[in-house]
Design a protein with these regions (language model features):
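Glycine-rich cofactor phosphate-binding loops and adjacent beta1-alpha1 units
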Residues: 160-162, 203-282
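C-terminal hydrophobic helical "lid"/dimerization subdomain
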Residues: 1-3, 247-251, 291-344
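Cysteine-cluster motifs in flexible loop/terminal segments that predominantly coordinate metals
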Residues: 37, 82-133
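Short N-terminal strand-loop motif that marks the start
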Residues: 1-60, 123, 343-344
Length: 344
């Protein structure tokens, strides 16, 4: 069996692995689709040594084998990879912070003892049974592969403290930005503005329900001032993952407003602390999600309150991964969410 690994800057290698067998508390999943994530693009651009299980972490598939101690799954079950439930016994859990479970976090970043030696850019993968969730029967295979990034945005909006009627700005119309925009609307924002330089992505934001989609810089500044009577946005979601966007988010917010940091920049950001202080900006940040939020988000996709299909821009085989990552890393790609189908 072969899996595609990002092994260095601009380098994807096909590496051969033995056909997997399940651990006693694990399952083997035949992968249907695996989405390309911003983390994969960062790894490809930077060559940073991410754990092999990190790249290719947005996958869905079918259980093909299970360990002797696994009772909750059977062969043929459709499943999606997710963050494990809180363990209940680590220091964070005992302190009443199950949402900061250290064991679940280690599994999420691929550093627990049962972490696989590769991610989901493969035909199949062995994984702890605690890491998978049964797919809602209403979801297609493609929708299932997009639940994971959708839940990242879901968690961020839940943490952000948005209020009914707020003027909300979402910076960036990639998969996370478009997901955040949809959840912000579902949370009751009065006006939702997407700031995005790419014309095609702006059009997609409008299709998915944004009230406005505008270019960054002066056009965005003027629109926000116009809609807020000169005050600024109540809350700004930073989904670009570039250093310059952090201060830009604060610049768009009103005094007493909020900024939610979701995009992960791989370099330090230059900020103007005085503007943060003068505006008394409240800041939240969001990484991944809680296990129970996965079920919530999946249910809302299943009943039509969140749309994934327009964000799915293309499907490729594993042999097209290198080219796709190069395109996405260029900064000029019009692709939104590319799914890898290892069966092609």
């Amino acid at each position: 069996m072969f899996a595609a690994l990002i092994t260095g800057k601009g380098t994807v290698e096909m590496v051969e692995f033995a056909d997997p067998t399940p651990a006693p508390k694990g399952v083997v999943v035949d992968i249907s689709f695996c989405g390309i994530c911003g983390t994969d693009i960062h790894a490809y651009q930077s060559g940073k040594p991410y754990h092999p299980a990190i790249c290719g972490h947005e996958w869905a598939g079918v259980v093909s084998a299970k360990g002797a101690e696994v009772k909750s799954f059977t062969e043929g079950d459709r499943v999606i990879v997710a963050t494990a439930p809180a363990c209940g016994s680590c220091e964070a859990c005992r302190a009443g912070q199950a949402d900061r479970c250290q064991v679940a976090f280690l599994s999420m970043i691929g550093r627990d003892p049962l972490a696989p030696a590769h991610g989901g850019f493969a035909q199949r993968i062995p994984v702890a049974a605690a890491r998978v969730v049964k797919t809602n029967t209403a979801l297609t295979e493609q929708q299932a592969a997009m639940v994971e990034p959708t839940t990242v945005a879901f968690h961020a909006v839940r943490r952000s403290g948005i209020h009914l009627g707020d003027i909300a700005v979402v910076q960036g119309a990639g998969p996370i930005g478009l997901g955040t925009m949809q959840w912000v609307k579902a949370a009751g924002a009065g006006v939702v503005i997407v700031v995005e330089p790419n014309e095609q992505r702006r059009a997609l934001a409008i299709e998915l329900g944004a009230h406005y989609a505008i270019e960054p810089g002066e056009p965005a500044d003027q629109l926000v001032k116009q809609l807020s009577h000169g005050l600024g946005a109540d809350i700004v979601y930073e989904c670009v993952g570039r250093p310059f966007a952090v201060q830009a988010a604060v610049d768009l917010a009103r005094r007493g407003g909020s900024m939610c940091l979701i995009g992960l920049a791989d370099q330090d950001a230059a900020i103007t602390p005085g503007s943060w202080l003068i505006k008394e900006i409240s800041v939240t940040s969001a990484l991944a999600y809680m296990h129970e939020e996965f079920e919530m988000a999946m249910g809302m996709i299943a009943d039509g309150r969140f749309r994934t299909e327009p964000m799915h821009s293309s499907t490729i085989g594993i042999d097209g991964l290198d080219t796709a990552l190069s395109d996405l890393a260029s900064g000029t790609s019009t692709q939104t969410k590319i799914l890898v189908d290892p069966r092609l």
